[in-house]
Each structure stands twice: as structure tokens, then as C-alpha cells.
Amino acid sequence: MKQTTFENFLKRLHGLTPDQTAILMQSVQDMTAQSAAQTAIDTTAGEGVCPHCGSSHRQKWGRTRTDAQRYRCSTCNKTFNGRTGSSIAHLQRLDLFYRVLEDMFGAVAPSSVRHLARQLGVNKDTVWRWRQIILRSLSQSITPLSGIVEVDETFVRESRKGSREWVRHEADPINHPKPPCLRWYEYKLLGVLKERGLNKWQLPVMTAIDRSGNRYAERLPDRKDLTIIQSLSPLICPDAALCSDFYPAYAKFAKTIGMSHVVLGTKPGSRKINQTFHIQNVNALHSRLKAFLRPFKGPSTKYVDGYVNWHFARNQSNAEQSFHNILRMSLQAVSVGTSP
């Protein structure tokens, strides 16, 4: 657009009604998201290889109808762009997908699926599927923890939302046995008291953090000694000083690795040693994690790892970086599958 035409366009904006202004702002927001997403796609395509054969020899081959840069492989003669072979290859509304990313990794708390769907004008199931695409692409980078390392576990209640195990049992009780857990409304209906404290329905989430701010969290299947040792062994440097509570598995892990171990109590006066050894940082991490999970009303157990990774990624990346990661991880998986 020429400068004079653009200036005339700006002058005419003063005559817009409030409703027209809102529509204009929405259009600008959509175009901005589309442009940012397209830039990320072109950047990723320029860094990657052919998703069909894995060759790095390619040439530019025009643009797609969505104005994405298309490439042609010089080895297999097939064309591709930055989304080919990725988990968002067939996504129609790339601008709305990018706005879901902005909501998930913005400065404010993420919106609920229903609220975000109303904002974007799409079905709630669409937003839910897009979120799952994003969560599956998230992973924690394992940085070895050194110095004083605080280790503890927090617990989340097992949730079988979406499993449909009771529906299958009632439809075919012979082939589908009765699920071990009651439905939520049956506790009050049958007068069954919920178990208090730690029980078999509480799933452990192992967390570790050092004084440099490096941290890691992982949902464990149980609290057995071998499970905890296998989880912590590749994570903590042997010359680190381990701070934990009195749970025996930590002592066995420290003895196995040969590292120093400081055991802290739960009573006042025993929670700190010389104002240096404590587990207050990891407890604060538990508090922030549970505050993040609380609005979701207990995510399903099979998605807990994704929500934990989401919580950590919110403090480490923004929407643009996350979009790059989704494309890069998807294309890496494709290139591994096509490599000889």
C-alpha cells in the first residue's frame, strides 16, 4: 500500500463506530497471529530437511495458497513446506492456533477451554485438540542438578476423566470388569467416605531443584526405592549435596551414588540446618504447581505429565518459541522415521 493511501486509510478510522472498531481490532489481531505463525513456519523450513527422504538439498519452489514458502527436494523431487509432516500439517486456522499458543504461554493465567473457544468462535473440542497437540510437543530439558539439590515429591489425585470405563462396564460387564474406583457422585450417594492422607489414589510427582534455579519434575508410577533411584540417577551430579525429608528412598539413593545427604525433619527447629540446608525452594515449587493445576479441576492422569511440562514451559518460553518447538520436534520425528 502506498504511503498516501495508508494515511488516508488512517484518517478514515476516526469515523468508525465502536462495533466497527472492535471488528477492526479483531481482524488486526488475527492477521498479526497469522503473520507470526507463517514467519515461524518459514524459519523452521529453512533450517530443516526434506520430510520425505531426509535430504538437505532443496530449492525454493513458489509459495502455497496460504503464502508459505514451498520447497522442492533435489533428491526425491517432492515438494514440501514448513508444516509438511508435522502435527499441524493439516491445520486450517493457523491464526487461531497461534492465539491458543499465546493464551497458553502469555503473562496472565490461561483461559478455560470453553472461554477461549467463545473468544475464537470455534468449538470447544477444537481448542481441546489444539491444546493436546501443544502439550504433546512439550518436554523438559534435563540439565544436571549440582551444588545443593532439594528433592521432594508432591501428590496429585488420580483422575480417570474421559476413560469411559464405567460406560463400557455397564454395556458389557462380562468383557469389561468393574472399575476399581467409584464415580465422584457415588461417594455421597452411597455414603462412602473418601480416604484421607496418602492412599493408592494419590500419584507422586517427583520434583528436584538446585540453588541455580535448574529444576525438574516427573510423575512416577509409585514411591518404590528402585523407581526413585532410577528417576534421580541421571538427574543429579554425584558431587552434589542432597537435601530431603526422612523418606528412606532418598537415603538409599545417596548411598548408591555416594553423595552427601542432609535429612531434614518436619518439626519446628529441624526444617533448616545453618540456614543453608532446607527444602523450602522445592516446597514453593509444589505450591506454584498446584496453584497452576487448580483451575483445571484435576486433569486426567494420562495428561498430568503434559500439564507439568506446560507449567515449566510457561516460565521459559513465549508463544513464538513454543510454536518453533512444536514444528521442530514434529519434523525431527519425521526425519528420524525417514532416515536410512
Predicted regions and their residues:
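Residue-level recognition of single "structural anchor" positions
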Residues: M1-P340
